Regions:
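Enrichment for repetitive, rod-forming helical segments
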Residues: 9-10, 276
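A gly/proline- and charged-residue-enriched helix-loop-helix capping module
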Residues: 127, 131-145
């Protein structure tokens, strides 16, 4: 009997030691109370290619995290929304439910969770990078972070996709009338759909992964995106005309599943947040530096570029004012005023 008891205790002790020795955790499993010695493997999803400033910044973030954690935390990037088969809203939902740990998504995509996320991207609400920085680093950014947090995602930092421009294969766009009847792809943001309807266009909601082929086949006539995305996605191969009008500012959320984040110890949380903020700052610098260079490259690729004057833009602003008025009621004047300051 004593031998049996002794044997049983030995088995239990061996099992306990084995359990203590196994500290590796996949972030998606959301183990609770992750300690400073626990290894983490985190999946990071981005909408665009690794060549875009998003991908370059995430690569820096991954390297910084691995180095500063002494190899304890490893991150793997999945570009082109590959984890959700190109479906951006589903990609965002995956971060909410924890099947994806981290993502970089535009607040335009967050709009599927709450129309208030349209706030920073209402037409010409934020007319300059100076105002964008003031808003995103101030009260407006804090309000936006609270909104993200309420959806089960912890916002670590804001990057930017930048100002969105419009391309098409039919004609130069200089006036609202030039948009009449054009089939323009938009993301699933109601305010953007309403904007193009006011301009007389035919907005078509579509995942970004489908855009190139749809333009190539003539399913749609045009699309709108920041300049680096237009270049890196080779949209110049299927689009002739580019109008630069800076009509929407487009922030990016560096977001992590909140349950996962809350399960981490304070030091790991701090490490992820600080390195994310460094990566976001780097991404913004890259994005703004690239804009002028990218415009020149798109011209070299054969695109006909029109840069609208303030007077030309005014005609579009007047046309879209009903959308601003409508969404002030939906979003709330206080939140919009925080972005206007």
């Amino acid at each position: 009997m004593k031998r049996l008891v002794s044997f049983g205790l030995s088995v239990l002790m061996a099992a306990a030691l084995a359990a203590c020795g196994s500290q590796q955790s996949n972030g998606s499993s959301q183990g609770q109370g992750a300690g400073a010695s626990q290894e983490l493997k985190l999946k990071v999803s981005i909408t665009v290619s690794e060549k875009d400033t998003w991908g370059v910044a995430v690569k820096k973030w991954m390297e910084d995290v691995e180095q500063k954690s002494n190899g304890r935390i490893k991150m793997k990037m999945y570009a082109n929304e590959s984890l959700s088969n190109g479906n951006q809203p589903k990609g965002l939902e995956a971060v909410q439910n924890g099947s994806t740990d981290i993502s970089l998504h535009s607040t335009i995509i967050y709009n599927v969770l709450d129309p208030k996320f349209a706030a920073p991207s209402l037409p010409w609400l934020i007319p300059s990078y100076e105002q964008a920085d003031k808003a995103m680093n101030g009260e407006a950014g804090q309000k936006l972070m609270e909104l993200v947090r309420s959806k089960g995602i912890e916002p670590l930092a804001f990057g930017e996709s930048g100002y969105r421009q419009i391309t098409n294969s039919k004609r130069p766009i200089l006036t609202p009338e030039d948009l009449n009847g054009l089939k323009i792809r938009t993301p699933s943001m109601e305010a953007m759909v309403a904007t193009y309807k006011e301009f007389g266009g035919d907005p078509t909601v579509m995942n970004f992964s489908e855009v190139f082929t749809s333009l190539q086949q003539g399913v749609i006539d045009g699309q709108e995106n920041p300049l680096p995305i237009i270049l890196n996605s080779k949209l110049y191969e299927v689009q002739k005309y580019l109008t630069v009008w800076n009509y929407m500012y487009d922030p990016i959320v560096f977001g992590v599943n909140k349950k996962l984040y809350d399960s981490l110890d304070a030091d790991t949380q701090k490490l992820l947040r600080e390195t994310a903020q460094e990566a976001a700052k780097y991404q913004i610098e890259l994005n703004r530096k690239e804009n002028e260079e990218v415009l020149a490259q798109l011209k070299e690729k054969g695109m006909e570029v029109v840069e609208l004057t303030p007077e030309q833009i005014k005609a579009f602003q007047e046309k879209v004012q009903p959308v601003i008025d409508k969404y002030e009621g939906i979003i709330g004047k206080n939140l919009l005023d925080a972005f206007r300051k």
